[in-house]
C-alpha cells in the first residue's frame, strides 16, 4: 500500500484538456518527496500494486497552465531504505544492462559477481536469462542463489522481444530492482538493432547499456575454431559491441592480445577482466554508468542467411537426470558422466551442468572452467545444457552412450526425467531498428 516513505513505481498517461497525449511513461519516486506533484501523490495514497486511478490536475494548481488528466497504474511498492528516505533524494532510473557474447564467454560469472557487489551496496538486483531451450542451468542457479530472476526461453531476446519486455515489467512489479542484468543466448548477435534500440525507443526513462563478452583464451588463439558461419556470428558480436569485456584475461599474458584488440577495434571501449576480482567488476559497472549509450550506436550490416546457417550448425540438448546408487556413489557417477560427455570429437560451444540444483560445472571451447569433488550420496540430480557443433541426433546418441558407460561402470541407475534435443530456428527479430 502506498504511504509515506515507500518507493513507488507507476506508469501513467498524461493528457491535456483537448485529449492529446503529452506523456506516456513511468517513474519511480519516494512517496512524500517533491519528486512528483503533491496533488497526484495525495490521490495515490493507499493504493496497492496493480490498482489504477485517474487524477485531474486543474489549471492553476501547482502552476499548471491547462487541465491535465493522468491515467495512473501502480506497478510496484516497497519500503524505502534509510538512504532513500532522505527527502528529495532522487531515485535513479532503472538500469538495464544487456550482455551478449559467445557461448562460454563468462557472462553469467560476471553477472553473479556483479549481483554480489551491488547487494553489498543495498541495490536490489534482478537477472533475466535467455536460451534457445527451455531448461536453463543458469536460470535455476540464480533461483538457488536467491537472486530475483526470469527466463526468456525457446529463442533469443531479438525473436522474443515481447517476452523480454514482459520479464522486465514482472521484475519491476514484484521485486522493484534498481538494476536488471539481461543475458542473451550465446549464439545471438545483432542486439543493438533488435533489442537495445527498441528498449531505448520504448523506454527512454530507463538507462540501457550493452556489453559484449569474449573469452581471452579464444581471442588469443585468433579463432573460435568452429564452422565459418559460426565464426561469422562471433565476429559480428564483437563488431557491434560498444563495450567489449575480455573475460578470463587473468589466464593469459594479454600484452599481445591488447595490441591486437586496439588494432582491430579502434574507438571501442575494451576492458580486460577477471570476473572474480571485485575491482574489475566495479570498473565494468562504473564504465557502463559513464559511457553514453544512445540511439546513434550503429546497427550491424549483417547477412541473416549466414547468421541463421551458423545457429543451425549447433545442436542443443537439455536433459534432466536422476542418478540412484546403492553404493552411495551417485555424485561420483554424475561427475564421471560429465567428464564422459565432455570427451567428444565435436567442437564444444558450451557444456553446462547443474548438480543437485546448486553446483554448476562448465566446459567451453577453451576447456573446463569448474571442478567439483564428489560426496557420498545415494541419489543425485543432473541438469545438462549442451551446445555443440554437430547435429541433434549425434549429440543425443553421444549423451545416451555416455549414460550407458557410467551405469555399467558405477552399477547405478540413471533415469531421464526430461529431454529435448534440437537445432535453433532461423532468427526472425520482432523489431529491427537500423
Residue spans for each PLM region:
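Nucleotide-state-sensitive switch-loop elements of NTP-binding domains
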Residues: 89-100, 105-232
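Canonical P-loop GTPase G-domain recognition
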Residues: 231, 235, 239-311
Amino acid at each position: 500500500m502506498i504511504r509515506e516513505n515507500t518507493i513507488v513505481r507507476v506508469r501513467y498517461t498524461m493528457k491535456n484538456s483537448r485529449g492529446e497525449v503529452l506523456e506516456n511513461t513511468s517513474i519511480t519516486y519516494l512517496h512524500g518527496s517533491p519528486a512528483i506533484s503533491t496533488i497526484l501523490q495525495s490521490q495515490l495514497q493507499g493504493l496497492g500494486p496493480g490498482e489504477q486511478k485517474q487524477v485531474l490536475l486543474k489549471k492553476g494548481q501547482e502552476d499548471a497552465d491547462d487541465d491535465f488528466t493522468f491515467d495512473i497504474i501502480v506497478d510496484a511498492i516497497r519500503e524505502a531504505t534509510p538512504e532513500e528516505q532522505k527527502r528529495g533524494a532522487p531515485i535513479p532510473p532503472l538500469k538495464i544492462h544487456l550482455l551478449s557474447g559467445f557461448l562460454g564467454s563468462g557472462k553469467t560469472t560476471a553477472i553473479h559477481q556483479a549481483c554480489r557487489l551491488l547487494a553489498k551496496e543495498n541495490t536490489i538486483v534482478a537477472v533475466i536469462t535467455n536460451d534457445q531451450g527451455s531448461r536453463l542451468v543458469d536460470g535455476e542457479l540464480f533461483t538457488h542463489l536467491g537472486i530475483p530472476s526470469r527466463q526468456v526461453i525457446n529463442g533469443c531476446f531479438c525473436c522474443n522481444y515481447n517476452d523480454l519486455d514482459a520479464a522486465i515489467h514482472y521484475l519491476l512489479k514484484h521485486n522493484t530492482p534498481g538494476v536488471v542484468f539481461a543475458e542473451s543466448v550465446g549464439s545471438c548477435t545483432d542486439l543493438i538493432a533488435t533489442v537495445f534500440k527498441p528498449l531505448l525507443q520504448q523506454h527512454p526513462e530507463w538507462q540501457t547499456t550493452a556489453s559484449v563478452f569474449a573469452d581471452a583464451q579464444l581471442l588469443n588463439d585468433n579463432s573460435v575454431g568452429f564452422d565459418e558461419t559460426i565464426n561469422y556470428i562471433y565476429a559480428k558480436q564483437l563488431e557491434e559491441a560498444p563495450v567489449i569485456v575480455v573475460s578470463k584475461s587473468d589466464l593469459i599474458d594479454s600484452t599481445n592480445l591488447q595490441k591486437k584488440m586496439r588494432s582491430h577495434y579502434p574507438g571501442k571501449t575494451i576492458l580486460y577482466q577477471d570476473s572474480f576480482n571485485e575491482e574489475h567488476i566495479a570498473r565494468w559497472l562504473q564504465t557502463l554508468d559513464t559511457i553514453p549509450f544512445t540511439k546513434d550506436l550503429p546497427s550491424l550490416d549483417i547477412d541473416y542467411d549466414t547468421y541463421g546457417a551458423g545457429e543451425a550448425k549447433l545442436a542443443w540438448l537439455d536433459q534432466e537426470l536422476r542418478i540412484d546408487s546403492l553404493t552411495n556413489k551417485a555424485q561420483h557417477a554424475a561427475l564421471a558422466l560429465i567428464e564422459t560427455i565432455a570427451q567428444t570429437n565435436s567442437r564444444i560451444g558450451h557444456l553446462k551442468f547443474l548438480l543437485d540444483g546448486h553446483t554448476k560445472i562448465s566446459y567451453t571451447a577453451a576447456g573446463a572452467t569448474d571442478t567439483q569433488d564428489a560426496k557420498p550420496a545415494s541419489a543425485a540430480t543432473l541438469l545438462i545444457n549442451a551446445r555443440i557443433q554437430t547435429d541433434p541426433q549425434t549429440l543425443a546418441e553421444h549423451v545416451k552412450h555416455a549414460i550407458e558407460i557410467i551405469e555399467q561402470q558405477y552399477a547405478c541407475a540413471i533415469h531421464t526425467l526430461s529431454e529435448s534435443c534440437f537445432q535453433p530456428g532461423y532468427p526472425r527479430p520482432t523489431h529491427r531498428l537500423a
